[in-house]
UniProtKB/Swiss-Prot annotation:
This is Diaminopimelate epimerase. The record marks Y270 as: Important for dimerization. PROSITE patterns: DAP_EPIMERASE. The active site is at C73 (proton donor), C219 (proton acceptor). GO terms for molecular function: diaminopimelate epimerase activity. Belongs to the diaminopimelate epimerase family. Pfam families: DAP_epimerase. Substrate binds at N11, Q44, N64, I74, N75, N159, N192, E210, R211, G220, S221. It comes from Wigglesworthia glossinidia brevipalpis. The record marks H161, E210 as: Could be important to modulate the pK values of the two catalytic cysteine residues. Pathway: Amino-acid biosynthesis; L-lysine biosynthesis via DAP pathway; DL-2,6-diaminopimelate from LL-2,6-diaminopimelate: step 1/1.
């Protein structure tokens, strides 16, 4: 199987052109492949499954490192776009990339960053995510965890997110907190969890724990969700810089109800080939 290793601010991917359907990849193989010591290592594996040349439409499948399927990955879409450019599968600076749940208009900016446009964020999580009926269709809930009250803001940006606002972005127990939230039947189908520190009216800092992959270096959909919370609840500017440990993403949301743009880099690391 031929593949390309790519990343966006350290959020790394293995991307496979599977349009000819030659690669029948099993969950066991995905887990083996994702191992950073005995495999290739990645946060997500992305298969390009279908291509409509007339409309520049590419259908993809996204798998987390634990082999569970993901239905949104903005950093991944950005890397797929760069893959398509490198492999000369597209000539223009625009493509529509997504799955059966929807497409994202993706384009190259003048300064060689990649912009992904997504549907308007939705400020609640549906009942299949939350186990307790009193939490269903809520915009936010307050939980008491480790003797502290924590406000969880819910946002759906193609996948579900829980955003926690804290001044202590380097919270040492972030991984412990995330695992607690995921294992204590609050979110039976799991959820992406982020801690956000608001630094200015146009700047936030983010730490992310992705469902199916664990703590990652960056996450495009988390950046979108956190920016949505910052704009909607805290009245931040419509253009926000989202800082991760390895760099920045930029989120632009003109107004509530409009599509949202997430802008950032995508980098090719190497090409390879591996046997099943």
């Amino acid at each position: 199987m031929k593949f390309s290793k790519m990343h966006s601010l350290g959020n790394d991917f293995v991307i496979v052109n599977n349009i000819d359907k030659k690669n029948n990849i099993s969950p066991i193989f995905i887990k083996k492949l994702s191992d950073r010591y005995t495999g290739i290592g990645f946060d997500q594996l992305i298969l390009i499954e279908f291509f409509c040349k007339k409309y520049f439409y590419f259908k993809i499948k996204i798998f987390n490192s634990d082999s569970s399927e993901s239905f949104q990955c903005i950093n991944g879409i950005r890397c797929v776009f760069m893959f398509l450019k490198i492999k000369k599968l597209i000539k223009k600076n625009i493509a529509f990339i997504g799955n059966n749940l929807g497409l994202s208009k993706t384009l190259m900016t003048k300064n060689k960053l990649i912009c992904v446009k997504i549907k308007p964020p939705r400020f609640y999580i549906e009942k299949d995510i939350l186990v307790n009926p009193k939490y269903n269709n809520k915009e936010k809930i307050i939980l008491r965890i480790f003797k502290k009250k924590i406000t969880c803001y819910f946002v759906f940006v193609g996948n579900p997110h829980c955003i926690i606002i804290s001044k202590n972005i380097e919270y040492n127990n972030f991984s412990l907190l995330s695992k607690y939230l995921l294992k204590n039947n609050i979110f039976p189908n799991k959820i992406n969890i982020s801690i956000m520190n608001i630094l200015d009216f146009d700047l936030i800092k983010l730490k992310v724990y992705e469902r199916g992959s664990g703590e990652t270096q960056s996450c495009g959909s988390a950046a979108a969700a956190a920016a949505a919370v910052a704009i909607y609840y805290k009245k931040l500017n419509k253009k926000i810089k989202v800082n991760f440990s390895r760099g920045n993403l930029y989120v632009y949301w003109e107004k509530i109800g409009n599509f949202m743009s997430i802008i950032g880099p995508a980098n090719h690391i190497y090409d390879g080939k591996i046997n099943f």
